[in-house]
Amino acid sequence: MAFRKENKTKSNFSKISIGLASPEEILENSSGEVLKPETINYRTYKPERDGLFCERIFGPIKDYECHCGKYKRIRYKGIVCDRCGVEVTEKKVRRERMGHIQLVVPVAHIWYFRSLPNKIGYLLGLPTKKLDSIIYYERYVVIQPGVKAEDGIAEYDLLSEEEYLDILDTLPKDNQYLEDNDPNKFIAKMGAEAIYDLLARLDLDALSYELRHRAGNDASQQRKNEALKRLQVVESFRASRGRNKPEWMIVRIVPVIPPELRPLVPLDGGRFATSDLNDLYRRVIIRNNRLKRLIEIKAPEVILRNEKRMLQESVDSLFDNSRKSSAVKTDANRPLKSLSDSLKGKQGRFRQNLLGKRVDYSARSVIVVGPELKMGECGIPKLMAAELYKPFIIRKLIERGIVKTVKSAKKIVDRKEAVIWDILEHVMKGHPVLLNRAPTLHRLGIQAFQPKMIEGKAIQLHPLACTAFNADFDGDQMAVHLPLSNEAILEAQMLMLQSHNILNPANGAPITVPAQDMVLGLYYITKLRAGAKGEGLTFYGPEEALIAYNEGKVDIHAPVKVIVKDVDENGNIVDVMRETSVGRVIVNEIVPPEAGYINTIISKKSLRDIISDVIKVCGVAKAADFLDGIKNLGYQMAFKGGLSFNLGDIIIPKEKETLVQKGYDEVEQVVNNYNMGFITNNERYNQVIDIWTHVNSELSNILMKTISSDDQGFNSVYMMLDSGARGSKEQIRQLSGMRGLMAKLQKAGAEGGQIIENPILSNFKEGLSVLEYFISTHGARKGLADTALKTADAGYLTRRLVDVSHDVIITEEDCGTLRGLVCTDLKNNDEVIATLYERILGRVSVHDIIHPTTGELLVAGGEEITEEVAKKIQDSPIESVEIRSVLTCEAKKGVCAKCYGRNLATSRMVQKGEAVGVIAAQSIGEPGTQLTLRTFHAGGTAANIAANASIVAKNSARLEFEELRTVDIVDEMGEAAKVVVGRLAEVRFVDVNTGIVLSTHNVPYGSTLYVSDGDLVEKGKLIAKWDPFNAVIITEATGKIEFEGVIENVTYKVESDEATGLREIIIIESKDKTKVPSAHILTEDGDLIRTYNLPVGGHVIIENGQKVKAGEVIVKIPRAVGKAGDITGGLPRVTELFEARNPSNPAVVSEIDGEVTMGKIKRGNREIIVTSKTGEVKKYLVALSKQILVQENDYVRAGTPLSDGATTPADILAIKGPTAVQEYIVNEVQDVYRLQGVKINDKHFEIIVRQMMRKVQIDEPGDTRFLEQQVVDKLEFMEENDRIWGKKVVVDAGDSQNMQPGQIVTARKLRDENSMLKRRDLKPVEVRDAVAATSTQILQGITRAALQTSSFMSAASFQETTKVLNEAAINGKTDKLEGMKENVICGHLIPAGTGQREFEKIIVGSKEEYDRILANKKTVLDYNEVE
């Protein structure tokens, strides 16, 4: 009879460890052995005995009923039937009882020899190919050479059948009768048995020392790496020594999972649907049994070997069918789903069942708008509410004595009798519901509402919640969930209620902003109209003004004077006379008086600021009421205003025809220039595109002027646009201007989208011609396709971000770091992208900040920078502030509140336990989806702003140049000018009086300069201009040109133009690396002055032998302009940065400051040598096809690119250090989002970047337990170095019994030992100081970082499940359940917010319960006192 035990796992465990299962453990957890491949009897539908569904092993199929039916009912619980051997118990044990299969021969576990890195292979030092040939019974392996060692046969040698038999023949007779542990015995085996023996014989410590020695001393880098890889596996086994033995990677007993987890369901028609696992198990059992029989009947070796191989393969398929080249397929040619497959992927155990479960007490329905709802309310259909709150209703029915039993109460609820409705009303009071709209992209995708019962079957949603849910009412559905426990209800009410979530956690701006109709109504009544009825009247107060309006004496738009309540500069409410309108008076009736009098026209933008102010001044509760008032007024006025629009409101400007004609004329001129041969085809194209872009933008401007002055700006279309209710300038332009340039169709794999040079001149009001329509359909369709594809990408980005940062939680108040980031205005050339105010607001200052002129303390170090302080700092001359940042936070786990700063969703300092990592990931991911969904609105219109190609003085100033090298020329107008030939030239505009630098500009190579250093210039003076369409190469000397290596069809091709017959020489990539195209400039006597390399793609515009003057252009390299700028470029860019990928054409970057000299040409690469002042020399190879950006004798700074291309984050990290790369990534990603007009606070990006920089790579392990090149956590690294700090390493143990060479001992132990030896006159122990490890900071992409987390559960549920579990098992890892995902998987509360471990003991209840408990407590106390 199989043995039974009750081993129920407790659910309050605090960690999970994973390891290899030993055969004993598998037996221990098994309830019996499965002997037969049968599943169930096809006639009786009862499980076969000893089969895969056997009731003896796994438990009964029906509750409390044995197989033969002798014992039925619960009273026999626990009895084992004497006839059929089935224990009488409940049927759910079939979900937890395991079985096992005892294999006749051991089998290797596929995870450990088929997945990379090959664990068994690394341990034994055998390559995968050889290992496979042993495991699959093709070769013998020598386990112990014994007497044959002198014949040159060594351990681990592979033998073929013949060789093996030869050796057996030549062995001494008695050899095979020796004991296995006799060193003379020759042993060779094949299959997993052989591997088992080899693994069992390993001495890990000796192997470890040998490999460490090899890794330290081997000259060949490849062998060194090999040794390090093997070391990692060896070290894993040494570290987990108690739990894991290498030979357990060979399976002797296969566990059988419980039958309910691999069900067999009868379908109608006598067929069965079965889980694939049953098939896989059956194959294993059949082959195992056949092998048993064959061994019993002493079958020949060949047959046995074949059968063993088949057994190995069947177990492989069972464990991981997708890894095998020949996966087991079903009849329908579908690979069977093995055990590994059921863990992997979106449908696997982790993501399908552990991280996302379906829940009870939920409902879903279509949503409709509920304009009469208050903030924080929602309408729930009666039927839905009755079903959701059913248990609560039943309880009340019984309490009120309406029914006696639960069953009858249930019936009443199901029949929906009248009595339940008022009970339901009562139950719903103070019991909020959660509404959720998929996709839940950020935390505002689930909010709590107080439900109201409504008729109908649709859920009513508050219109202001739409933005947060990204919902509209075109058929969206939402899910409703009911929080059940007191704790959950409390959290829903306090933390998740809609009216408490007015601010967007991504940027702190209000998210419940009225949109569309509401904005339009408010805009309409706050707009003024000159000449309206009652203009210029004066009223003594708002009441009088309203009476006059109601009596029809004054128009709602008329400018009038009214005495209203406003707030003066000290914040007191005073009565003042304001020039305003009745509409504005009506609006201000709703605005809380503390917020002042709003006397502007209200658009969506200004409304957002007003709401922000109201929240700041009056708090969230008042703000919610204010929002409700605004909503009602907006809807009412949009209705009263009758704001429809008709075709006549779309006005086409009269100037359109002349503008278009002007465009045609200019294009004609450009084409003439081209035909005359003045410009190349590419330039012609760029200029044409430029002309049309200009025409389009000019037309847009005229159109805006026209439409905004129509009917004093009361044109409906203009009102919609201007208020921000609907539509954009783009769309209006296409309706009544011209559609403009469109992107060209793009072939797969071609260069980015070119632009069609004939624009669409019609607009939608005039209608498009067939051709125009056809061109524009392409853009529109591309938009739709992009949207569909990019949504998935954005979702995947969010998933990776959450995975990398889910364990970042605020763990402490202050980590006490002294470091921070220096913040300044973020500028691009001279326009401020982000002001200092925005960047420091809500952060914590590192130092005291003192006003430089007045000397007052603005903010103390370690204090929050509030709005007032930030404003003062912005207005003062202070240019940079050092703030605390999560990038520099030194908290051991998570981050500290001071380094994070203000929680944007509440505008207060962040609290301990806030899950800032997840908030950051959502804040970055959510707009990612928005961005991608935004492509198609412009209908594929090519949005490219005309390239600006000059520097013009913005104000009068003095010029200062840096690194300027020029050549004097005469420009095309005949004026004297200079051409810049230095690559690093910069011009600074300096204020003449104060000497403050106003702005700094880069002066590009090849630009024409019209001023000199130190000049005073007036505002509007042209400083420099350059060719925006071409990069150029300019000669710096006068002389004769001679080409070298310029060979037709080898290094250049000729493109002749059909239209003009002009021929152009274009440099191409040469197959022959010895031929390097270059241009020499020679003197009259033929002496070489300069040489210029000709880069690939350059158009040579000078003939061979031609004379050139200094400053002339010899090569033009067309820049790729006129690409359609889509976020399609944006999302991949964000991914590229977060994954820390190197761009496709990385620039070569100088690592030191120094002087440049050009070296020789080696294999198609030019050598560039940088020599620093200290004499350090660095050599770089730059492919000749690239343009080299430095010249002989230039002085370059570290980090300067030497060739064109993008700088890689890895280079920035290596050269400029961690801070620089962190700022680089944050700013680069911010740029992508800014381009789309999406505001996200820097701190969110900082959290992700912090997670990317968690690890260091060991350079020199010293005496620590690390290996060279190992990647470890920064913290772990510091702890390990602290551990050996001050300790000694034994060099020579002398006569000591207790110490070995290489042992690490404390100074005290050493002193004791040595004094003992000294007393006995023995040789003392010699030591040296322990050497600490050194490391380099590395930057990991978010995917790498997520897979490298300390929690294996989190990593396994992210990606590469099998690989992660595999590694974790070998290392015997323990998961301490510190992050979020691990805890969700284990069904625990997450360790953040109210789930923090210190709140575990708190119980939420009512006052009555508390009093009752206290009363009981008193009686007990009295009882004790009586004693």
Curated annotation (Swiss-Prot):
Record's cofactor remark: Binds 1 Mg(2+) ion per subunit. Binds 2 Zn(2+) ions per subunit.
- What GO annotations for molecular function exist for this entry? DNA binding; DNA-directed RNA polymerase activity; magnesium ion binding; zinc ion binding
- InterPro entries from the xrefs? DNA-dir_RpoC_beta_prime, DNA-dir_RpoC_beta_prime_bact, RNA_pol_asu, RNA_pol_N, RNA_pol_Rpb1_1, RNA_pol_Rpb1_3, RNA_pol_Rpb1_3_sf, RNA_pol_Rpb1_4
Residues annotated as binding Zn(2+) 1 are 66, 68, 81, 84
Keyword Membrane: yes or no? no
Q: Name one GO cellular component term.
A: DNA-directed RNA polymerase complex
Which CDD domains is this protein grouped with?
A: RNAP_beta'_C (cd02655), RNAP_beta'_N (cd01609)
The similarity comment for this entry is: Belongs to the RNA polymerase beta' chain family.
Spell out the protein name for this chain: DNA-directed RNA polymerase subunit beta'
State the species of origin: Bacteroides thetaiotaomicron (strain ATCC 29148 / DSM 2079 / JCM 5827 / CCUG 10774 / NCTC 10582 / VPI-5482 / E50)
